[in-house]
């Protein structure tokens, strides 16, 4: 057969049988077929394209498609052949067989262009005229395919719009449906907004709401919603937009009782797309009786139905919730979300309907109803009355886990009006805990939030569960019971949200809570980690056991905790008890969703926990504060470099946490007595020196500091005040000079940044002026200044992308214990150093420090011309000459790179050579091995 293809090109298409075509396909799909045979097959098939009849053209196109798929190198040639034949068919006399072949050719061309991107651009040769001509002349089945796949061809949206709008009047219902779907796709693409065209398309969709076919009416509803929304947005005046919205909404209401289930489902989905309407119309959807405000009212911009009025919306949602098909009920409940956002009265009127939906037979409907209630509760508009409580309690003990989770989410936001309902709700939750013990962590979290929202019933709750606490002391089984853990969760939640006297809570509650720390931490992990929970419970236990001790001493910690959770989660339960408008809450939630930056939230949480730890240390809980800070460092270590937080920012926060950790270790020595023992004095001095070194390193090693610089400078001032308070006799002069200099720098920084100085800075400057040159410094005044230091403010962190860490590396190529550098005692020796600098500014002063084991050291200045490039990373070779060659056979030197801290006004070196200011080191010391030159 192959030879006949090569020798005879005059084979009549009519003489080719299906067996012959099947043999050709066998050659195509056989991987062992030679290239020459494939070439002959290609020539034969392309020849049949131009002279083939409709009987075999379908098979020829299929074979060419298979050939292009198997032999990708032939795809461009096959594409060109089919395209040429398509254009030839377009220019010939139109026949039904030709039109069908043209559509099949388009299908093959579209498939080839998608499989071979290199030839996709050639598809543009099929212009809008060719496509429209084929579309208009194609048979019904082929026309349906063309309309469904129109987006696969480079046809302008204006041409597609005209085609779809025209075919929406086609006598065949499937064509009308596909045409409407095409109009919807054009609208969703957002590239067609001509006013008259939009109104015309909307009008046509409204006309098709009365179509005899269910599928056409269903597509018409979708078209009315999407094109109606575009039409609403096109209105410039607010009044016109509102009237247009009402017109579209009422137009949809007119078909809510359609006999087709699909149409009714689409109507309620469309309500969610429109999202709003006038208050009177929305309220009318909840009442079958026409309300007085809506009688006779007609929207002015209704384009297609002048007789529609507000009465068409009567009982729309009641019909939706009572529909016999669950799909309709689900869609009706789902559309409550968007409508409840834009209406104040609507949620109050709708709660009883949603509560009834909690008895629905279908789980998906109940779940949607709970989500709608949660949405309303999140806006602060949910008021659970006694009538609704049985339905809500049934949801809490529902067999579906998703239902129970959503019900508990509502419980976290619920605010019940009286103690009777509170007790009923607690009983329901405890029943759920017994039925589903696996839900215990989430139930504890829900009870914790519930307790925070009902602190006015704290005394009653404590009284109710006091018997359980008493029984627990004598029963090990009761002590470990889930009922007890739930009771304790309610009791310990109250202090975090209320300044009540903590003595109203028995100390036994906090003691048992400490014993159940692991269980509580797993349930409250979304609000605080185990270290912070331990600190909180310990602090509460101490205060509650002290007779008459009020909660005021611990307020600083609990305010920090509350602020931390409010900033992290945006949870309204943890905010102060002020009335917040529903609109503000909605906008806050929306802004939180738009940010969507989990890494940034995580770091914000870390920073606020740092503040809480510092305030905790001031309350005398230094061990708990140190534990919390170490946990912060471990959490920071989990953030990788590819997160949205820059490495410079992470390095800065880690250094900052380390400084605060040192200050927390220092603080107990300042909190109790001014005069301390010699051992303690040495320990404090070492800690203070480490704090000063770390602060100096932060100032030198980080570039791009903006508001963070004020934070560092305040820490420097704070360190000076601590030194003056403990060691003012021996270091008064240097401390006062450094204090004055730092205050001036900080004031200049605030002027440049146009920011307001903190109270700490203002009070310190005022006190410094009062001290003057006096020899006697008021220690009480110093202590007051130390105690008003806030240590942290979230506004002082801007997470600038310009915040970068300066670092360096130094290597001595080829040097090691077995390949030392040769030297002669007493003579200088050259050390070849390969230096890498990262983020080093041009105006820095770098020194290479070379030291011996006996602490003798030498500084070598690095000329800025060596690293004066513009790149972030700079590499260069530098030969350092050292004169420290002792009389020894072998010895080692240590080399490192440091940056001179020029901002320090006091020179600390009197030598002629070397840095005149303190040096902050940018890398770890590197050992250099040297060996005496061997005599030969």
From Swiss-Prot:
It is found in: Nucleus; Endosome; Cytoplasm, Cell cortex. InterPro entries: ARM-like, ARM-type_fold. Disulfide bonds: none annotated. It comes from Arabidopsis thaliana. This is Protein SIEL. Hypomorphs (siel-3 and siel-4) have reduced movement of SHR and cause defects in root patterning. Inhibition of microtubules results in mis-localization of SIEL. Intracellular shuttle that promotes movement of SHR from the stele into the endodermis. Required for SHR association to endosomes and localization, and for intercellular movement of SHR. GO terms for biological process: intercellular transport; root radial pattern formation; snRNA 3'-end processing.
């Amino acid at each position: 057969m192959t030879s006949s293809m090569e020798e005879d090109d005059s084979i009549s298409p009519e003489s080719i049988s299906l067996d012959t075509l099947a043999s050709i396909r066998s050659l195509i799909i056989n991987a062992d077929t030679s290239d020459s045979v494939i070439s002959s097959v290609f020539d034969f098939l392309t020849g049949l394209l131009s002279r083939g009849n409709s009987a075999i053209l379908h098979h020829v196109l299929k074979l060419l498609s298979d050939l292009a798929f198997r032999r990708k190198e032939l795809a461009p040639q096959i594409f060109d052949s089919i395209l040429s034949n398509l254009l030839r068919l377009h220019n010939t006399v139109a026949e039904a067989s030709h039109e069908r072949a043209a559509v099949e050719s388009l299908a093959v061309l579209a498939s080839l262009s998608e499989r071979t991107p290199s030839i996709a651009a050639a598809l543009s040769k099929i212009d809008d005229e060719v496509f429209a001509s084929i579309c208009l002349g194609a048979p019904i089945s082929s026309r349906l395919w063309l309309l469904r796949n129109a987006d696969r061809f480079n046809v302008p949206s204006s041409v597609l719009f005209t085609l779809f709008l025209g075919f929406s009047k086609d006598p065949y219902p499937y064509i009308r449906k596909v045409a409407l779907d095409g109009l919807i796709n054009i609208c969703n693409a957002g590239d067609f907004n001509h006013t008259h065209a939009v109104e015309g398309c909307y009008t046509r969709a409204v006309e098709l709401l009365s179509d005899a076919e269910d599928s056409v009416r269903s597509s018409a509803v979708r078209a009315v919603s999407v094109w109606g929304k575009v039409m609403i947005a096109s209105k410039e005046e607010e009044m016109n937009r509102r009237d247009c919205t009402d017109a579209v909404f009422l137009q949809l209401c007119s078909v809510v009782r359609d006999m087709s289930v699909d149409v009714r489902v689409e109507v309620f989905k469309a309500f969610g797309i429109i999202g709003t309407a006038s208050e009177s119309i929305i309220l009318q959807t909840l009442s079958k009786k026409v309300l007085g405000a809506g009688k006779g009212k007609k929207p002015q911009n209704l384009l297609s139905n002048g007789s529609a009025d507000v009465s068409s919306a009567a009982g729309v949602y009641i019909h939706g919730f009572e529909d016999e098909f669950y799909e309709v009920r689900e869609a009706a409940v789902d559309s409550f979300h968007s409508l409840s956002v834009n209406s104040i009265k609507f949620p109050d009127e709708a709660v009883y309907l949603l509560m009834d939906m909690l008895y629905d037979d279908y789980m998906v409907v109940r779940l949607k109803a709970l989500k709608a209630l949660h949405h309303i509760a999140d806006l602060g508009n949910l008021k659970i009355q006694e009538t609704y409580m049985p339905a809500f309690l049934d949801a809490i003990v529902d067999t579906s886990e998703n239902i129970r989770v959503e019900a508990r989410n509502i419980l976290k936001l619920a605010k019940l009006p009286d103690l009777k309902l509170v007790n009923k709700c607690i009983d329901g939750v405890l029943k759920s805990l017994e039925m589903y013990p696996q839900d215990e962590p989430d139930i504890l979290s829900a009870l914790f939030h519930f307790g925070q929202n009902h602190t006015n019933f704290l005394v009653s709750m404590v009284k109710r569960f006091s018997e359980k606490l008493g029984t627990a002391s004598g029963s090990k089984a009761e002590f470990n019971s889930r009922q007890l853990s739930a009771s304790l969760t309610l009791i310990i939640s109250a202090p975090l949200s209320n300044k009540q006297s903590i003595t109203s809570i028995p100390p036994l509650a906090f003691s048992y809570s400490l014993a159940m720390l692991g269980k509580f931490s797993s349930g409250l992990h979304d609000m605080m980690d185990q270290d912070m929970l331990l600190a909180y419970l310990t602090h509460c236990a101490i205060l509650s056991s002290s007779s008459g001790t009020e909660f005021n001493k611990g307020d600083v910690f609990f305010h920090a905790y509350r602020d931390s959770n409010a900033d992290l989660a945006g949870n309204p339960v943890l905010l102060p008890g002020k009335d917040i408008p529903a609109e503000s809450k909605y906008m806050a939630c929306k802004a939180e969703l738009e940010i969507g930056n989990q890494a940034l939230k995580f770091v914000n949480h870390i920073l606020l926990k740092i503040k809480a730890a510092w305030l905790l240390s001031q309350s005398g809980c230094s061990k708990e504060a140190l534990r919390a800070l170490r946990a912060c460092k471990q959490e920071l270590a989990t953030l990788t470099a590819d997160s949205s937080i820059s490495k410079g920012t992470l390095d800065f926060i880690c250094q900052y946490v380390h400084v605060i950790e040192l200050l927390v270790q220092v603080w107990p020595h300042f909190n109790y007595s001014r005069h301390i023992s010699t051992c303690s004095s040495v320990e404090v001095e070492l800690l203070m020196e480490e704090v000063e070194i770390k602060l100096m390193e932060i100032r030198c090693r980080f570039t791009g500091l903006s508001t963070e610089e004020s934070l560092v400078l305040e820490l420097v001032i704070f360190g000076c005040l601590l030194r003056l308070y403990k060691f003012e006799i021996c270091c008064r002069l240097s401390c006062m000079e450094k204090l004055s200099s730092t205050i001036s720098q900080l004031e200049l920084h605030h002027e440049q940044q146009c920011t307001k100085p903190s109270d700490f800075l203002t009070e310190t400057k005022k006190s410094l002026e009062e001290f003057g040159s006096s020899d006697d410094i008021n220690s009480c005044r110093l202590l007051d200044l130390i105690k008003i230091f806030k240590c942290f403010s979230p506004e002082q962190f801007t997470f600038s992308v310009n915040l970068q860490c300066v670092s360096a590396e130094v290597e001595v190529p080829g040097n090691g214990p077995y390949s030392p550098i040769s030297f002669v005692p007493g003579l200088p020796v050259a050390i070849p150093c390969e230096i890498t600098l990262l983020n080093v500014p041009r105006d820095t002063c770098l020194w290479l420090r070379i030291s011996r084991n006996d602490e003798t050291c030498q500084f070598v200045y690095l000329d800025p011309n060596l690293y004066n490039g513009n790149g972030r990373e700079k590499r260069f070779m530098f030969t350092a000459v050292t004169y420290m060659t002792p009389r020894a056979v072998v010895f080692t030197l240590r080399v490192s790179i440091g940056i001179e801290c020029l901002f320090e006004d006091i020179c600390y070196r009197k030598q002629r050579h070397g840095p005149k200011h303190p040096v902050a080191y940018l890398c770890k010391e590197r050992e250099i091995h040297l060996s005496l030159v061997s005599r030969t």
